[in-house]
Amino acid sequence: MVPPTVVRPRQGAASPSFPVPSYPIERVRLGNGLRVLFAPDRTAPVVAVSVHYDVGFRSEPQGRTGFAHLFEHLMFQGSANVGKAEHPKHVQAAGGIFNGSTHPDHTDYYELLPSGALELALFLEADRMRSPKITQQNLENQIAVVQEEIRVNVLNRPYGGFPWISLPPVAFDTFPNAHNGYGDFTELAAASLDDAEDFFDKFYAPGNAVLTVTGDFDPAEALTFVERYFGDIPARAVPAPGSFAEPVRSQERRERITDRLAPRAALAVGYRVPDPIGDLTGFLAYCLLADVLSDGDASRLERRLVQHDRSVTGVRASLGTFGSPFEQRDPLLFTLEARQSEDATADGVLAAVDEELGRLAHDGLVVGELERVQARVVSSLLREADDALGRAMSIAVHELRRGRPELVNELPAELAAVTADEVTAAAASLLDQGRSVLELEAGAAPTA
């Protein structure tokens, strides 16, 4: 384990000092544009390998809703030198685990294995980066698989897709920000082989990806493997990142949906926040505000809505509607989600939220409140970075979004530097904009 340093807050911030790791990070860029990050740590005999492609469901073409998710599935259907279903077999036979996931702004694939299997993981990832098996049979099979996922996880589950699928079309107007990234049955069924090949050619170029290796390995040996397997993958043009910008509304927008399976009404509220890339310092105040409002029994909305008013059975504040707050581009939402009690109304809950935000903006934080929240958030980041896989995913996202993989070491200091005034100003800003409100009406009989 790398010896920790001690981070002390700037003047006006909370008083605790946080020990944070200083993980070494080495950066290499191959001739084909592939960015490679090495973060060795000999603590445990495991390695994590991840490949992050700079494309998520906000970049998929209009008329092909869910295509980024579908293509993630296609990447597991074999490649030039790896048969169908052999990728999982190879990883599991080596004692490892694997997965992939599609996010608003990236798609990731990873393996976590014993350190002796590093070369295997790099070979597998390089082979599918070079030549995945995009065939009509694989396409049709995976369309059916994704459609079944939608049935199970959204259509036939209480609160399925709430609010990550159902709130964005209330909060945003453009297709990239508002559409359902999980997938639409009709548009998935219309996907063609040409669509898949075009998507691969455009977004799955080595120059549009970040390869990360963390854990128990020798960087010199790893670089030899990387150059052997990835070095001769042909370079292709990389799409320029488009803007998803939308203006912040001045008026509230409210919509209502019915969930035939939900036993209780629910409420989701979205507010706009500063650009998480262009204004990271400003954005971090909202990260702490989310925990001030809803993390733990002592948080403000937990005390007010759950314990005092008993208007909701649970409340959660978060940044974004899907994934880590640090992985997304602008715009994203500060989201409140609550499951209402039987006799509660959405207007009553919203009025109480406004009161608590106003009280926080006017009266400020109480003694020790910011320190408690900072300690929780920093502890969560430290736990995430403590294992090889969590570290790999964090490092890759920071490189992809900001070109700063070292943020895995620096974020605790950045959070410790946020002041109480910045958090209260963030609370005030939520009251000064037109929020987006989604009411979910219960369609099922209430449970006891």
Task: Report the location of each language-model feature.
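Acidic/histidine-enriched segments that form metal/cofactor-coordinating
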Residues: 2-8, 13, 53, 79-80, ...
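C-terminal regions of mature proteins
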Residues: 2-18, 210-212, 360, 368-448
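Active/ligand-binding-proximal structured segments within catalytic/core domains
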Residues: 33, 41-91, 280-293, 302
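Short acidic/His-enriched helical or mixed secondary-structure segments at domain edges of catalytic enzymes
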Residues: 147-166, 245-264, 307-319, 363-409, ...
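Buried hydrophobic packing residues in well-ordered domains
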Residues: 33, 51, 69, 91, ...
